[in-house]
Amino acid sequence: GIPCAESCVWIPCTVTALLGCSCSNKVCYN
């Protein structure tokens, strides 16, 4: 997928999750 410039190491994807991004390997991907 495409990296969404947000990490999800400590907290889940927040803002980018609204854009359809999900956590994968500690990084939010679309």
UniProtKB/Swiss-Prot annotation:
Family annotation (PROSITE patterns): CYCLOTIDE, CYCLOTIDE_BRACELET
One record GO biological process: defense response
Keywords: Disulfide bond, Knottin, Plant defense
S-S bonds: 4-21, 8-23, 13-28
Crosslinked positions (Cyclopeptide (Gly-Asn)): 1-30
Domain of life: Eukaryota
Keyword Iron: no
Record's comment on post-translational modification: This is a cyclic peptide.
Free-text note regarding domains: The presence of a 'disulfide through disulfide knot' structurally defines this protein as a knottin.
Family per similarity comment: Belongs to the cyclotide family. Bracelet subfamily.
Functional summary from the UniProt entry: Probably participates in a plant defense mechanism.
Record's protein name: Root cyclotide 1
Native source organism of the sequence: Viola hederacea (Australian violet)
